[in-house]
Amino acid sequence: QRIKVGGWKEEVWYCYYSIGRAYNLLFTSDNMRNSNYIFHAVHYWMEAYNYYPDRIENLYEIVKLYREQGKYNLAYQFYLMADYQRKHHYSDDHLFHAKSIYDYKLDYELSIMAFYVDVKPTDIHKNIYRLLSNNVIDDTIFNNILSNYKFYTPRLRDLDKGEHPQNKIQDVCREFVKTNPGFSMSTPSIAMTEAGELAMNVRYVNYKINEKGEYINKDKIISRNVMYVLDQQGENLRTSFNVQHDAQYDGLYVGLEDIKLIDNDGHLTYICNRGIQPNKIQVEYGLIEASGVCSSRLLELEHQHPIEKNWVLFKNKNNSSLQFIYNWCPLQIGTFLDKSETNDTRTHNSFISEKHNTPRLFQRVRGSTNGIVVDNELWFVCHVVSYENRRQYYHIFVVLDPENEYKLKKYSQLFTFEKEHVEYTTGFVYNTNKKKFVIGYSTNDNTTNFVDISKEDVDNMFIG
């Protein structure tokens, strides 16, 4: 009756929209047996579009309906109609305006069905990053988006130029494994030394990850680390030695986990995770001498958590001091206390000195590599984990601006190295002359791999 009377366009449109929703509710409450309900629902939603095409809530309902029925091509065509209206006729001055549909729910539908229809990769990546950066999306939808992204994520291995020491290092790793039964080669960390040589730490572990993603541990979880140094051409192994650690903290966890290397004025410096007790992990920081001996200390923050890991180092270009990234949302930058040179009475030996805001996605970002300078910018590789039946690791390039208090400058789309579930990197280097990156990584904690990728290819992965 209200439709027949006419009058205010918003009310008439809302009547069409509501009748469609009522038929859809009948369809779902009838256990989806009577398809006539769906026919009537779509009919009234289309009448709403014909009457007032500027609004898209009705089109969204059709998109969602067909997507849930697996009719992805139909759903996508109605998505395109809704997206066009949203871009060209958007207004929030509507009766009962459903802001969430315009802001993210329509895009969320595309993130689910894009795998089945002809969507340009650049379009789906932009769509997903709008969603992942939206601060009002609830955790359930956010987690679903992250889970679905595995179907769209690029594989960095496909861009590999092959100019890296993978074969040479894998050969020496296999020799280590032969003489140390029960150990597997794992994540390499790499850093360019002041002398222009490539320093590389390879971690060897005594546990396995099975096909279900479960860790198969022995009585003790042991990490052994071997340092390899290649010449300036990266072709010949100049030296290698075992990294020796402070054994006083060995227990269930033995050794240094996830060493991340950085050259600090000719001193090979590292930061790593150190299992102290079954439910206590701290971060260790120190130097690796040419003899393999480490001088180290456990880092302590005021009010730190029982489990601390994934801190990463960088060199502050303004004062040449090493600092660390503690957290990514907000971006928290830490400073070391040198108590030997001060009268500081604090019991901790590091503190958070700066904080900067970052997008929603960075709540999930964790540090992987130490920072390196690339064209006057500070670059990191970080990781994001989607917690599913099997964990899914993604990676992301993050760039900070040294000229603006090390605030976030830009970041890339998420990527994988080989689309394996568990992938990890702890180091990368940049060749200024060749304008390329070499990144070391592992898959499922039982490989030692490298990828060589041009800066141009990486630049094409950045958002915006």
Question: Where are the model-predicted features located?
Answer:
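Start-of-helix register in tetratricopeptide repeats
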Residues: 11-14, 57, 100, 105, ...
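Structural motif corresponding to the intra-repeat A-B loop/turn of tetratricopeptide repeats
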Residues: 26, 35, 69, 117-118
